[in-house]
Curated annotation (Swiss-Prot):
GO biological-process terms attached to the record: translation
Signal peptide: none
One Pfam family linked to the record: Ribosomal_L29
GO terms assigned for molecular function: structural constituent of ribosome
Family affiliation: Belongs to the universal ribosomal protein uL29 family.
Entries under Gene3D superfamilies matching the protein: 6.10.140.1970
Gene: rpmC
Keywords: Ribonucleoprotein, Ribosomal protein
Lineage of the species this protein comes from: Bacteria, Pseudomonadati, Pseudomonadota, Gammaproteobacteria, Thiotrichales
GO cellular component, one term: cytosolic large ribosomal subunit
Superkingdom of this protein's organism: Bacteria
Membrane-spanning segments: none
Organism (species): Francisella tularensis subsp. tularensis (strain SCHU S4 / Schu 4)
Name of the protein in its database record: Large ribosomal subunit protein uL29
Length: 66
């Protein structure tokens, strides 16, 4: 159910808000990479979820631009 809720949330936002959310996710992904490099990261599944959320946002942005 979480995916459907996030999709509804993303679709309700404007393009500018989606761009901001994408930037936040990219920053989160960068911080996860740094934690992995230093050996502090124990939850590797967060990479996959962050990348998928970024892809979802990119898809919605392209849909709204049409």
């Amino acid at each position: 159910m979480k995916r459907k809720d996030t999709l509804k949330d993303y679709r309700g936002k404007s393009i500018d808000q989606l761009q901001e959310a994408k930037i936040e996710l990219l920053q989160q992904l960068f911080s996860l990479r740094m934690q992995k490099g230093t050996g502090q990261l124990k939850k590797n599944h967060l990479f996959k979820s962050a990348k998928r959320d970024i892809a979802r946002i990119n898809t919605i942005i392209s849909e709204k631009n049409k």
